Regions:
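Conserved acidic catalytic loop of the alpha/beta-hydrolase fold
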Residues: 93-112
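Gly/Ala-rich beta-loop-alpha elbow adjacent to hydrolase catalytic centers
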Residues: 116-120, 124
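Conserved HGGG/HGGXW glycine-rich cap/lid loop of the alpha/beta-hydrolase fold
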Residues: 8-81
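Conserved alpha/beta-hydrolase catalytic His-Asp/Glu region
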Residues: 149-151, 167-232
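Catalytic active-site module of serine/aspartate enzymes centered on a nucleophile-bearing elbow/loop
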Residues: 260-305
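Conserved serine/cysteine hydrolase catalytic core
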Residues: 202-258, 263-266, 299
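Short beta-strand immediately N-terminal to the catalytic nucleophile in serine-hydrolase-like folds
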Residues: 114-116, 141
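Flexible "cap/lid" loop of the alpha/beta hydrolase fold
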Residues: 125-130, 134-168
């Protein structure tokens, strides 16, 4: 099975599907507690258009290794140190650097489309802004940077409680169960997601959340994301949200990469994983937008299907 390591302490599981000669490659990045299979509703669609598709389980998730984090790490250690086997962190910037190294290993040097969900968007936008020579389009799904500092500071109890690690998974399960699913979401989806979250190692989950939004400098906070990404997202950008609030940061605070091509789409009523439950509508937006930005050939009006 394919694994890749930038930091020797992490073996990252990935799949490389589609033609190696494809003109464009899609990198799929998941959110907190998720795995590559969360994109199973999109992969067949992407492959049907002869795109190369790279799916990866990031640090601590899915089939990738999840070594015990160093509790002394309270800020991102940086590019070089995050590759050191003695440095075990779970910041999204480290995840992004892992993915960039993997793409280089696979010989992917241009025409990359990044699609990321929720916490994965911190890594996705990092990749898009760090490597504008590589990324030609960015697609964000319910970006985590919708949350402002005011909300993050209100929730510091999640990290400051003396029993924080013991409480973090039950707290997240309660939060996700309450706020991330609508009455229209089927029971099987909610059951699957929350049972999967319950399987996590508590120390790894704590480290993922700390790196994602607990650290006052983390990219999962609106103000930090705007500071890090505003004006640096040069590629066309499609932002899809489960409600208007989730797309607000991109709409109101992050300048467009391309005035003519950037879009915001809201698909309401199907929760945080709407790309699973409304996959035909979601994939339809991807197809239309890919045609708009030139990734797929445009279909002339009235052309036979």
């Amino acid at each position: 099975m394919p694994y890749f390591s930038r930091n020797p302490s992490f073996n990252l599981f990935y799949l490389d599907e589609g033609p190696r000669t494809a003109s464009h490659t899609v990198l799929l990045i998941t959110g907190l507690s998720c795995e590559m299979h969360d994109w199973s509703w999109q992969v067949p669609f992407l492959l049907s258009h002869n795109l190369r598709v790279i799916s990866i389980d990031s640090r601590g998730q899915g089939k990738s290794s999840a070594p015990a984090p160093d509790p002394k790490i309270r800020t991102w250690p940086g590019v070089k140190k995050s590759a050191d086997a003695e440095v075990i962190d779970y910041y999204p910037q480290s995840t992004a650097e892992d993915m960039l190294a993997m793409l280089s290993h696979l010989g992917i040097t241009k025409n990359l489309i990044v699609i990321s969900h929720s916490l994965g968007e911190a890594a996705g936008y990092y990749i898009a802004t760090t490597r504008p020579d590589l990324v030609i389009a960015s697609i964000g799904v319910d970006p985590i940077h919708a949350f402002p500092n005011a909300v993050r500071e209100r929730d510091t109890y999640l990290f400051n409680d003396p029993e924080a690690q013991d409480k973090i998974i039950p707290t997240l399960i309660e939060f996700f169960g309450t706020y991330c699913y609508s009455p229209e979401c089927p029971a099987w989806q909610k059951t699957w997601h929350l049972r999967r979250m319950a399987q996590f190692d508590k120390a790894v989950m704590y480290a993922l959340c700390w790196g994602g939004w607990g650290d006052a400098e983390s990219l999962g906070r609106q103000e930090n994301a705007v500071k890090a990404f505003a004006g640096k997202l040069k590629c066309p950008r499609l932002t899809l949200g489960s409600n208007d609030w989730y797309v607000g940061t991109d709409r109101d605070h992050l300048p467009k990469g391309d005035e003519a091509l950037d879009e915001i789409v809201v698909i309401e009523g199907k929760g945080h994983w709407f790309h699973q439950l409304e996959s035909e509508e979601f994939n339809g937006h991807l197809e239309r937008w890919f045609q708009k930005i030139g990734v797929l050939p445009a279909v002339e009006a009235g052309a036979a299907s």
